[in-house]
Amino acid sequence: AIRLARGVTGRDKIVKVEGGYHGHHDEVMISNKPSLDEAGPAHAPHSVPQSGGIPHGVVEDVRVVPFNDSDALECALAPGDVACFIVEPVMENIGICLPDDGYLEKVRDITQRHGTLLIFDEVKTGITAGFGGATNQLGVRPDLITLAKSIGGGFPVGAFGGKAEYMNHITDGSVLHLG
């Protein structure tokens, strides 16, 4: 999903939420659980690699914001160089953390104004939150969505999808996706 967002927008940088977990690839193994010494100020967290071996350039391409802080997201997107904002609409890897009323609507508005794709990570909430996942339950439509555990029924499976205008970049071969 992140590669697709980068291919569609022509931008390299991404924004994620501090404490958000989106798998074990370099771009998202940033600030999953940074030490308090490394985390930086609460309103402007630092991008902290969670493992050795993550290239410095990757860390520089990831900005981190606090969950439920739309002002911080606005600042992170202001330079106009961000391909996507990836977020769990309901954060579950730090406990069940619901979005504040109006937060996701603000996120949708901010990302649209900045030409940044909004990716909902519904690996856990995709079906478990109800029909249509948290996306349907909370009423905010992302550009792309990732699914896995919630659709697997115990089997290791992953998927992503989204609006045709973005997914067509895979169909026409301008963005490669295999696997």
Language model regions located:
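Conserved N-terminal phosphate-binding loop of PLP-dependent enzymes in the Aspartate aminotransferase
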Residues: I2-G179
